[in-house]
UniProtKB/Swiss-Prot annotation:
Highest taxon listed in the record's lineage: Bacteria
Family note: Belongs to the UPF0398 family.
Name this polypeptide is given: UPF0398 protein MGAS10750_Spy1462
Regions that span the bilayer: none
Pfam family, one: YpsA
Length: 171
């Protein structure tokens, strides 16, 4: 079994507030290309954390690819209450994350800040690599996860960057 964690920018972090934004289709083209590459190289599990934005779009693509490839999808939420306060539209997205092959939460609820690093350490230990939409030009809290991932020997990281997206949009 080979599992890849998929994570990246949340939609508000990159200024995308509408699913019909033309940038979403370019991002999804890149996701499709990269996920097919993973599948053709033996990956059989895609792991999500349940965030809006990049993960949401990657989940949509992964679900489409299930018709062509034998893949499994898991969502491992940080907390059991993840998304409980989201609006109705986002609750629909949350239900898609909960309708995958395997769903768990790591902690029942928030108790202390160290839970975040424990959660990311768990995800790193349970996956062989990560597909991350992230660019050092636009830093977020993902930088802490990436630092841990880069420190792990043999952990495979594939970054989707703004430069790569620009190249795709021009071709």
């Amino acid at each position: 079994m080979t599992a890849i964690l998929i994570t990246g920018y949340r939609s508000f972090e990159i200024g995308i507030f509408d699913h019909k934004d033309p940038r979403v289709s370019i991002i999804k083209q890149a996701i499709r290309k990269d996920l097919i590459g993973y599948l053709e190289n033996g990956v059989d599990w895609f792991i999500f954390t349940g965030n809006l934005g990049f993960e949401q779009w990657a989940l949509e693509v992964a679900n489409e690819l299930k018709e062509e490839y034998p893949l499994q999808i898991a969502t491992i939420f940080l907390f059991e209450t993840h998304g409980d306060r989201w609006n109705e539209k986002n609750q629909e997205v949350l239900s898609q994350f909960r309708a995958v092959d395997f769903v768990k939460y790591y902690f029942p609820n928030y108790e202390q800040p160290t839970q975040f690093s424990q959660y990311y350490q768990f995800l790193l230990e349970k996956t062989e690599g990560a597909y991350v939409f992230y660019d050092t030009e636009n830093e977020t809290n993902l930088k802490y996860f990436l630092k841990k991932a880069k420190d792990m020997p043999h952990y495979q990281l594939l970054l989707l960057t703004f430069d790569r997206l620009n190249d795709m949009s021009q071709s």
